[in-house]
Amino acid sequence: MAVTTDQKSQVILDYQRVAGDTGSPEVQVAILTTRINSLIDHFKEHVKDHHSRRGLLRMVSRRRKLLDYLKSRNSDNYRILIERLGLRK
């Protein structure tokens, strides 16, 4: 269910702009997407886990806000990021 430190570090390395970058919107969205995907797998087994579902909805909302911010600041990076993460169809 939880994302391990190694998985999180790998996501940071894959999406960082420069070495040591952990706070850019791209990295934050990628980390949230990883956590959201792990929770979605969790809900396949634990359908009645409503407490965690509330946390999932908060993460989705936070990711949406970060994506809106990124789209308003740099639409090229936004399009590249959603393609890499496979968020839009």
UniProtKB/Swiss-Prot annotation:
InterPro entries linked: Ribosomal_uS15 (IPR000589), Ribosomal_uS15_bac-type (IPR005290), uS15_NS1_RNA-bd_sf (IPR009068)
Xref: PANTHER family: RIBOSOMAL PROTEIN S15, BACTERIAL AND ORGANELLAR (PTHR23321), SMALL RIBOSOMAL SUBUNIT PROTEIN US15M (PTHR23321:SF26)
Highest taxon listed in the record's lineage: Bacteria
SUPFAM superfamilies according to UniProt: S15/NS1 RNA-binding domain (SSF47060)
Protein name: Small ribosomal subunit protein uS15
Entry's family note: Belongs to the universal ribosomal protein uS15 family.
GO cellular component terms, semicolon-separated: cytosolic small ribosomal subunit
Organism: Nitrosomonas eutropha (strain DSM 101675 / C91 / Nm57)
Transmembrane spans: none
Single GO molecular function: rRNA binding
Subunit structure: Part of the 30S ribosomal subunit. Forms a bridge to the 50S subunit in the 70S ribosome, contacting the 23S rRNA.
UniProt lineage: Bacteria, Pseudomonadati, Pseudomonadota, Betaproteobacteria, Nitrosomonadales
Biological-process GO terms, alphabetical: translation
Pfam families on file: Ribosomal_S15 (PF00312)
Gene: rpsO
Keywords: Ribonucleoprotein, Ribosomal protein, RNA-binding, rRNA-binding
Function: One of the primary rRNA binding proteins, it binds directly to 16S rRNA where it helps nucleate assembly of the platform of the 30S subunit by binding and bridging several RNA helices of the 16S rRNA.
